[in-house]
């Protein structure tokens, strides 16, 4: 657990909060897909960040983490913010270009990359079961991408890159997790990502239509709610118990995509999805890659 979190062993309540977060994240993706028909990716990313910042500031004031917002890990915060923001750009672009289920599925490959990045960066041992899970996960990725079948889309690689960048963000947080409470990590990410994502608006600004404003605000609100639900869930139950439930966002996204857009997946994608999800569950349980956090970027671990 991170500093400032009070742990209570309430697995059922924790599981419900994590499932709730998974559903909220799927709704964020759905709204991003809707507004992406009217706004460019740069606009959507910026408003997601600035709206989340508005809703997270009261949470920060309420939580009052020990030491306030003072940090000794500024470089790691910058790395986490750069990789997390890059993951967000990739994820939102993929949502606009791909089926909702495909975007979520490829972005959810991040737990497969975590052991590899952790080994190369902090020399964290990769367990035997994790090695086989990683191999199975990459086989699943190939089945989803289907290179050579004539139905490959470049946006799939963008979604996959988002998964890798999200994994890099998670390992960055792992490095900070013993000295930084979760709310401080979220605060710095939201501040940095809001400021950085404001830059591209100088050449990409388009005034949203009146109805779109409400959707952008709702995206930010839901992102903050999802953040809170995940934090609450992981304060009530061990990650090994509730971590696998974070893949519920793929299930919810698949259902939403089918209901609203008539999206379906072929049998190779279903097999690939099974392998990726199983690989992610195994590596999450084995490495302790807790998922705490950033609403639309996916997950950030704490220990």
Predicted regions: what is each one?
Residues 3, 251-303:
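C-terminal-most transmembrane helix of multi-pass membrane proteins
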Residues 13-20, 60-61, 65-90, 154-162, ...:
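Loop-to-transmembrane-helix transition segments
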Residues 22-30, 57, 81-89, 111-116, ...:
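Hydrophobic/small/kink-forming positions within alpha-helical transmembrane segments
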Residues 30-33, 41, 56, 148-208, ...:
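Transmembrane alpha-helical segments that form core, pore/gating elements
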Residues 38-86, 165-168, 188-203:
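Transmembrane alpha-helices of multi-pass small-molecule transport proteins
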Residues 91-93, 110-132, 251-270:
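C-terminal transmembrane-helix exit sites in multi-pass transporters
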Residues 104-109, 176, 180-192, 227-258:
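Helix-helix packing/entry segments at the starts of transmembrane helices
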Residues 129-145, 166, 268-287:
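Hydrophobic transmembrane alpha-helices of multi-pass small-molecule transport proteins
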């Amino acid at each position: 657990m991170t500093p400032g979190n009070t742990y209570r062993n309430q697995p059922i309540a924790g599981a419900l909060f994590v499932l709730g977060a998974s559903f909220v994240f799927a709704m964020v993706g759905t709204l991003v897909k809707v507004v992406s028909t009217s706004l460019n990716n740069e606009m959507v990313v910026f408003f997601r960040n600035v709206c989340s910042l508005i809703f997270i500031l009261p949470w920060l004031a309420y939580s009052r983490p020990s030491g306030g917002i003072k940090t000794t890990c500024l470089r790691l915060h910058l790395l986490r913010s750069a990789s997390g923001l890059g993951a967000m750009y990739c994820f939102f672009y993929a949502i606009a270009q791909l089926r909702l289920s495909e975007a979520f599925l490829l972005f959810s490959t991040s737990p497969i990359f975590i052991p590899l990045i952790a080994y190369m960066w902090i020399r964290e041992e990769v367990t035997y079961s994790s090695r086989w899970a990683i191999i199975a996960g990459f086989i699943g990725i190939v089945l989803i991408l289907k290179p050579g079948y004539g139905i490959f889309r470049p946006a799939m690689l963008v979604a996959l890159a988002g998964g890798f960048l999200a994994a890099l963000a998670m390992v960055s947080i792992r490095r900070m997790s013993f000295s930084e409470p979760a709310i401080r990590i979220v605060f710095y990410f939201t501040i940095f990502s809001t400021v950085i994502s404001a830059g591209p608006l100088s050449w990409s600004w388009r005034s949203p239509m009146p109805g779109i404003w409400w959707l952008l605000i709702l995206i930010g609100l839901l992102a903050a709610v999802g953040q809170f639900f995940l934090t609450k869930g992981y304060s009530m139950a061990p990650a090994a118990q509730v971590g696998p439930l974070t893949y519920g966002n793929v299930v919810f996204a698949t259902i939403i995509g089918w209901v609203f857009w008539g999206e379906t997946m072929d049998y190779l994608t279903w097999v690939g999805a099974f392998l990726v999800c199983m690989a992610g569950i195994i590596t999450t349980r084995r490495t302790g890659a807790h998922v705490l956090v950033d609403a639309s970027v996916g997950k950030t671990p704490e220990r």
